[in-house]
């Protein structure tokens, strides 16, 4: 369903002269149209009856029933609501004329100018005049008051229809005739004001008769608008009667205007009731909020006035936390409620005053002043409660601080003393070495110093416990028990400390003798152990050599190492004798310590194991060195074999490159001789491929043997490959260049002497001897040959010889340019002149002449592509050889 735009209010302005200007000059000839006359008869009759039925009468024939003027006067009284002069009751003609004149005079008194309408014509039953008079009445009493945005009556009615139907699809009201033929406009007007009467979404634009009948039936049944039109007449008439349509549509305007007035009145009542309901809601909300707030204050004040102290800090902290929770969570919403209550009260009083209602008087005890007083009492109780809480917390805090100080000092002492008795009772020194005993003795001295330092803390703990007892601390029993345990433990620690010192000093003297022997062992065992580890590393070292000289050097070093082994064995036996002496002393005095040496991590078992390992590795090293020596001899043979071939192939490739280069720039002899020589070079190069393949095989063997250098040659396989590929590319390119030169020479008609001269000039200015001239070299070459070049001309020439912008000029480009400059080339003009000879000097040529003078295939080619000649003297079948020739050289669009 289409959405309707919000209603718009319009200002109605009426100008009597303007609205009648168009209608006073209505075209009487139009009423002669039978279709229009039929439509107006039906519409005007229905309109008149819609008003006359209010007086209990109606008309059947519009031109007959108004002839005596009685029903005409009655119609005017009904539609105007005013009384007309008393009619004449006679049946004579002059009575009828008098009654009609009274009606016409009344119409004229309303500012309506009646043009060419006389009472005699109405009395005589003149259809045109009667319809014109009724139309004038309709304009004055049904349409005149319709004015939208200072428009005339007709334009105002049209604008009203346009605005009401604007939101609807397929509706475009532009006039009062053709715009209404599909019936959608009438349906849209009904749906806009009474959407319950019609389902607009189900209407079909292709069913105009059905749409019109539906609209008129609904209007007659629900809107009290009689059926004034025939749907078939409207649809089948090319241009329906405008006045009939306007009359019918104006009935919708008046019907819906009354509905809008009723809606406005209902809205005004709803607005007043809504204001009253909102005021009542605010009153109820104020009463509810005031009751809840006062009840909360009543419950809270006794809680704040409770001053019962607690014995512990935790209990007082709980009260303080409850108070803070009250301040953070419970009170802020109530503050907001109190503020909102005052705002609602003031807002309500303002609304009541604006709407002329009596002021609001809350229930007893719920005035704003009552709430403010209760709130003030709450604030006072809250302030005293907070001060009492803080004072109590400060008092308990002082007592708790002293108890916490006792606990901290007691905990610190207990933590320090934990495990100390067990440590002092240990016999760890009985199995310790001299170093460990000395360390234990120093550690014990440090403990004695620490013990003396803790004497003050123990005294402080006892003093604090005494003070807590005097202040009647609630947990004094536990404090006293803890203090007594600390003092008893302190006495035991002093006794155990003295006993441990004496035991440590005795053990120190017993172990000093053994320590000297351990030290001597460590001084000699460490160097010998390092020597054996180094020897094992050297004997197991992975060696990588690339020559016979390198492996021979390793063999010599190994022989020198084997010569030092007898001396090393003597040192080993001396170290073992020292260790045996240590074990003898330990057994003699029954000392329960480990036989391990504190000065060395080396043991005799390690020395024995490593010495055996050294003796096993020596022959293994001998075998590895001999195997590597044999491998290096084999690699040397591969190097010499590869070098012999590479030293022959490398110079051969270089020599061939030089020969090809000399051949490509020579300026003597014919190009064919040069070509034959290059072909011979190519044949020799291809036959030489077997040598390259053999060298590749030797290179493969060298790579498999992991030989990375070769002092016998400067050539690598990569050098040979690059040189060989360059040689193949160079010979192929050079042969192609000579072939191109031969083709150019033959095509351009250049002599061998000219070609040699071009080559000599190019070679002279090819300073880099790479077969290329740069821009400056090319400019110098052209100047030497007599060219007077400006910048623009030289730039043009460069685009010819260097179209890709490479910055260089090849010999072939140079030859192409020189041949264009010197050779006798074909042009479009030359070809046109040749065709003119074949055509016997005619501006056109015939197909028979082409077949007679040219080979068949070329003649057919020309006939197929030559355009028809249409110039002066043209004959049937004439062909335009001039346009064809220009097209061959790109000088036309053919």
UniProtKB/Swiss-Prot annotation:
Residues that hold Ca(2+) 1 according to the record: 766, 770, 777
GO cellular component, as recorded: actin filament; cell junction; cell projection; cortical actin cytoskeleton; cytoskeleton; cytosol; dendritic spine; extracellular exosome
Binding site for Ca(2+) 2: 802, 804, 808
Family indicated by similarity: Belongs to the alpha-actinin family.
Pfam families for this protein: CH, EF-hand_7, EFhand_Ca_insen, Spectrin
Domain annotation EF-hand: ranges: 753-788, 789-824
Molecular function GO labels: actin filament binding; calcium ion binding; channel activator activity; cytoskeletal protein binding; FATZ binding; identical protein binding; integrin binding; LIM domain binding
Lineage: Eukaryota, Metazoa, Chordata, Craniata, Vertebrata
Protein name: Alpha-actinin-2
